[in-house]
Amino acid sequence: MKRQAWYLFLSVSLVILIVCGLSYWAFCQAMRAETNVRYSGMQSVISLQLGKTISGMEMSATNVFNEVEKHLDSPEAVIHALESESNLNPDVRGYFAAFEPNYFKEKGTWFEPYVHHTDSSKFEMTQVGSARHDYTKSPWYVRAKNIKMAFWSDPYYYYDGTNISGHYSTFVKPVFDANNNLACVCGADITFEWLGSELERINNGCRNSQQVNKYRLMRALDFYSMVLHKDGTCLIHPEDKNLPITDNKMLADLDQHNTGFVEMDVAGVPSMVFYGPIDGIDWAVAVVTPLSDLQKPFTYMAIALALLALISMIVTFVICRRI
């Protein structure tokens, strides 16, 4: 092949490589934007739906607490109010009313009736207040007494050797009598097992959504979700997928209820974590997806453009030889 043909071949090949390189760069920019929008949007939807579930729990619990407030004339009336309203939301593990010391003199210092599930359909009432369980010193009781408004307690593990032992979070609300004095602190317990099943139900809804699955772009959409406390503690996660938060920016974002994403190893798998707060509670939802799944479109497009460049250069070489 003559020198002029080589010059032509090399010039055209250079143009082909530049065009393919720019095409891949543009594709990468678009795919990164699409990935962030897709998974940030998915995280936002999961947070919103889980937040609605928690808000529904709050409304149901508030109805129970309002009934307690209407029946502060006797301890029997309080117990009846708890028992009569407990079936409104079977997902609540139990309702309690922890009264101020000697509010009912016949009940003494500690009176805390607790109406709770014994199985999937039955409730029973237990008096749990005692010198051994001095609820008046519990953080949730002290906080409710001080701030005089409803809130969610920090997650905790309760153990008493019975079937109600487990990981809990409690929606707490102070209840006042007709003279605006604190009568008791009411609470509704939810278990992390129940919340985990709700999170998985929401995840499955997202996985099977037609809108999510319409443009997979060669990805398996292999994601899962976690619930994080604002201090970085992983509250709910799939088995063997615990996420220890060590990234300072992520910890700051969780504490300040900001959204974001970060690349980190989860259970030994390089992953991308998209996180954001749940409204009304100091928790956040994190959507985790393996980097290997996110990289599939980039890998396939790089191979396709490389093959296209190679074929184009071969065709150019053949044409240049015949000139």
Stretch-by-stretch model annotation:
Residues M1-A33, V37-R38, L305-F317:
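Extreme N-terminal signal-anchor transmembrane helix of membrane signaling/transducer proteins, especially
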Residues Y24-S40, I46-A61, E67-E76, L88:
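Membrane-proximal amphipathic alpha-helices
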Residues F65-E69, L82-P90, K145, N203-A220:
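Short regulatory alpha-helical segment in sensory/regulatory domains of signaling proteins that mediates
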Residues N87-G166, D231-K249:
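Extracellular/periplasmic ligand-sensing ectodomains of membrane signal-transduction proteins
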Residues E106, T136, W194-V285:
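Intrinsic low-complexity, intrinsically disordered coil/linker regions enriched in small/polar
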Residues P139, P297, M301, I319-I323:
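Juxtamembrane alpha-helical signal-transduction segment immediately C-terminal to a transmembrane helix
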Residues I164-G205, M272-F274, D282-D293, P297:
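Conserved beta-strands of PAS-like sensory domains
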